[in-house]
Amino acid sequence: MAILISYFCFLLIFFLFTLILFFGLNKIRLI
């Protein structure tokens, strides 16, 4: 159970990091 929760947290952090990186690259392109 604990492994599943930790894996889910890691996935959520990775998704958020990818989303921030994607928006950051788009902002750099627009400038």
Swiss-Prot record:
Disulfide bonds: none annotated. It is found in: Plastid, Chloroplast thylakoid membrane. The keyword Acetylation does not apply. The keyword Transferase does not apply. It comes from the Eukaryota. Belongs to the PetL family. Component of the cytochrome b6-f complex, which mediates electron transfer between photosystem II (PSII) and photosystem I (PSI), cyclic electron flow around PSI, and state transitions. PetL is important for photoautotrophic growth as well as for electron transfer efficiency and stability of the cytochrome b6-f complex. This is Cytochrome b6-f complex subunit 6. The lineage of its organism: Eukaryota, Viridiplantae, Streptophyta, Embryophyta, Tracheophyta.
